[in-house]
Amino acid sequence: MNRIAHFFLLLINLFSVSNLSSQEALIPMPQDIQWSGNKLDLSKGMHLEIDKSIRKNEVNLLRDILEGHSINIQKDKRGPTISLKIVSSLNGVDSEEGYGLKIDAKGIHIQALASKGIFYALQTLRQMDFHEKQVALVNIRDQPAYSFRGFLLDVGRNYQSLSMLKEQIDVMAKYKLNVLHFHFTEDVAWRLESKKYPGLTAAENMTRWAGEHYSVAEFQELIDYCRDRHILFLPEIDMPGHSAAFERFFKVNMQSEEGIGHIKELLKEFSETYPTLKHLHIGGDEVKISNKQFMPEITKYVESLGFKTYGWDPGSNLESTTVRQMWMGGPNSIDPNAGLQYLDSKHLYINHMDPLETVTTLFFRRFAEQEKESERLSGAILCSWPDRAVEKPEDMFLQSAVYPGMITFAERIWRGGGESGWRASLPGRETEAFHEFAAFEKRILLHKTKYFADLPFPYQRQTEMFWDLIGPYDNAGDLTKEFLIEKDPFGDHYHVYKNQVGGTIILRHWWADIIPGVIESPKQNSTFYARSRIWSDKTEEKPFWIGFANLSRSYASDSPAQGAWDELHSQVFVNGQKIPAPKWKHPGQKGGLELPLSDEGYSFREPTKVQLKEGWNDILIKLPVGDFKGKDWQNPTKWMFTFIPYH
């Protein structure tokens, strides 16, 4: 590895991030944006010109933006003007969510076909740089590639407070996501008050977060909160699966005649209690169908109540009128002749992703192998499924990259495009794809600093971590076997298998049949090594994220043994010194869905302190693997590592 070149690239990255202005850091980046070199001076305030048809919510949002930058609102019409107008046509825009945003010497001019577009234009304006009450001149034409841009919250398994939900809704709105998929019924609990059957939400009927549920008033408050932010509230009543809480209370199977009667009562009460809701997800997945008439009958009943229905695919026997939410299988195209409507959620479960991998895979995603909305595909839903219990709700935001994932997904689904297939690691640094990701990473890191300083945001800059992968060495099934490279890691006589960039490197993905790792034809009973060098201006101890088998938050995975990083005998050496694994709180604990993770993942424990010397520091990661089967399906073999400075 060329030390001078590495250091030069590192300096370039640091310089470019520090000099990236908010003006260039819009997320999602608009479809068409043209900057001018000049600026508009707002130090003397602005005059407002607002159409009477503009909603009060948008007017208040505009006032909040101006007040946030201490820009006064003036009655004098001779100064700069900010105008909000709904127009019948707009060049380059054919979506109600699209907009035109122009800043010139006369002021700020926003036009849209509907109030949604005004709202999204203001979200773009909110991210503009108003330093010293000056803003750059720009001309924007923007609209989404997909009209359905969703985020799923699973509060059935792990309850979240109203304030926590509103925090996430606010982030959704700021990044132009427009559907909240609200999963509130589960095996562990039914979390919505029923006036007809109040015992359904009793503490004794819940196996986790006992008694925690949403009252009718709170549920309505969520609906209203979403509506005010142009977010469709999509509740899910999962039927007939994930219904153990229902069955504990009613003492019948949901698919039985009596069970159907009870669920219809609840559905009728739901429709009468929340008459403004017109969309309902009816579930249908992960259940043995004993009554083939259940789903057709329930679907027709739900539709008779005035709802458009959504269901999981694969799942039960859905009706043709039900929108299919795809969640299993590889990156396949939709059959254009199927005559059905789809949403994509395949490999969009962040609970199965490493935090750094989350941003990587979502940035490059092409939804259902399409670059934009089609007649059969209206969009996608990013899902957060914390199946495993958590000690406190905040843990969900550190164990999974909720906010980094949300805004990366928002970028991709608004802009469209992406690349065919799925990836878990970064492309080569000479490629255009890498440079596109690096540019986005600069934007997301600026947003982390500017907008998420007080919120959990498990992401670190990874485009400056350069690795040589060396191997494979045949370990003959002995994962502790040592090879010469451990004594002389930076000798010139080793064959470099591949140069790889990234903070998390997945050698072989545990879903290798659909997601490639960085090793093209991985072999069992192999050992690879990853080597790198890191510069330090002085001798000091610095924090690092170090990890190996990133445990899914949906499996009952076992905790590593004391003294081991993982079950593969992976090791880390810095300047020839072995870095010990953390002292685990629950070493060797057999996994269980009711046993919360505590420190097993690098993103939700204290960073590992590593002693660095002045100058270049040698990093060597040992990565042995035996077979690829894993102990069982709860403990798949995860041949991977994370090593990255923590800032």
Task: Walk through the language-model features, giving the residues of each.
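Flexible, acidic glycine-rich loops studded with aromatic residues
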Residues: 328-464
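Accessory carbohydrate-binding/adhesion or oligomerization-edge regions at the termini
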Residues: 438-525, 551-553, 584, 618-647
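Feature activates predominantly on carbohydrate-active enzymes
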Residues: 93-279, 386-388, 595-597, 619
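Acidic, contiguous N-terminal accessory segments
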Residues: 20-140, 311-312, 435-442, 449, ...
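A short beta-strand element within beta-rich, extracytoplasmic domains
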Residues: 538-562
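Beta-strand-rich ligand-recognition modules
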Residues: 557-559, 563-640
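Active-site neighborhood of glycoside hydrolase catalytic domains
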Residues: 246-323, 327-336
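Short beta-strands within extracellular/lumenal beta-sheet-rich domains
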Residues: 522-536, 604-608
